[in-house]
Amino acid sequence: MASPVMTYGIPGALKSFIDRCQPFYMAKYYRQQPLIKPDHAKIRRMLFICIGGMDKDDIFTGPVLTAKAFSDIIDAKYADELLQNDMDRIGNIEKKPEVLAAAYEKGFALGKRIVDEREK
């Protein structure tokens, strides 16, 4: 999942999508009928990529908590994250090739892990 930070949270469209998953939360925790079968849930993973404009370390607290809650609801283990603040000053992520490289590496590693676990 990828998202910018908007006022210490995730943008409305993505948040609305996540909020629409409330029935899956209820099915999983109250009715004990999760949407994802346990054998499939064990291989599901989430990588959270998030950028923020402000040069503050705490701007990711809300988005990370939301992403972790969402990953739990959809039975996708929160496997990793890539967070980049100070984008108002940086301007273009292409000015941070190390961040682009990290995004590629983390995405590749996540995909490899899923494939490896599926083949077990």
How would you label these PLM feature ranges?
Residues 57-120:
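Glycine-rich phosphate/pyrophosphate-binding loop and the adjoining helix
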Residues 1-68:
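Helix-loop-strand module that forms the ligand-binding subsite of alpha/beta enzymes
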